[in-house]
Curated annotation (Swiss-Prot):
Membrane-spanning segments: 3-23, 41-61, 65-85, 104-124, 132-152, 167-187
Function: Probably functions as a manganese efflux pump.
Protein name: Putative manganese efflux pump MntP
InterPro entries per record: Mntp/YtaF, Put_MntP
Subcellular location field: Cell inner membrane
Gene Ontology cellular-component terms listed: plasma membrane
Organism: Yersinia pestis
Record lineage: Bacteria, Pseudomonadati, Pseudomonadota, Gammaproteobacteria, Enterobacterales
Signal peptide from the UniProt entry: none
Length: 189
């Protein structure tokens, strides 16, 4: 795979993380650049690791994992999305009571859920002549950049939307989950 194809793949793989991080940024009380960078790093590292895992799986057991990856991603995103919607529907909270940061595990779970498609890509890359390490690094870097930008964009969208931002963020996560299911069903049909 040439450099331009790798860059296009990397940024395409980062779009789920970008959308999810906009929702995450919108639900925080004035997230700082440090929080945005932390989110970007978590998403980027996980998004870089998953194609490597997928590549290894592709070498050994692709038919088994491909049957379930979309259901795992959908379930995680659906649960997280429902949780965000539920929190957004609770009694309105003053701006000063909004969270200052998301927990590490919430970010990791969201990052894993949005990166399972990168694992599936890694499975496919196992059958091509690619430098998987450089490709995974490009995917991780693009995701880090896009997730950081998403958090910063969410910072400015959040005050405009108030608590609705959390509901919208939850809907976005559920939508990403349904999109993963749709793409899988469409590809297997």
């Amino acid at each position: 795979m040439n450099l331009s194809a790798t860059i296009i793949l990397a940024f395409a793989m980062s779009m789920d993380a970008f959308a999810a991080s906009i929702g995450k940024g919108a639900t925080l009380y004035k997230p700082r650049f440090r929080e945005a960078l932390r989110t970007g790093l978590i998403f980027g590292v996980i998004e870089a690791i998953t194609p490597l895992i997928g590549w290894c799986i592709g070498l050994f057991a692709s038919q088994y994992i491909m049957e379930w990856d979309h259901w795992i991603a959908f379930s995680l995103l659906f649960i997280l999305g429902c949780r965000m919607i539920f929190e957004g529907m609770k009694q309105r909270v003053a701006e000063t009571e909004k969270m200052r940061s998301h927990s590490f595990w919430v970010l990791v779970t969201t990052a894993i859920a949005t990166s399972l498609d990168a694992m599936a890509i890694g499975v496919g890359l196992a059958f091509l002549q690619v430098d998987i390490v450089h490709t995974a690094m490009a995917i991780g870097l693009a995701t880090m950049i896009m997730a950081t930008l998403g958090m910063l964009i969410g910072r400015y969208i959040g005050p405009l939307l108030g608590k609705r931002a959390e509901i919208i963020g939850g809907i976005v996560l559920i939508g990403i989950g349904f999109n993963i299911l749709y793409e899988h069903m469409h590809l297997t049909a």
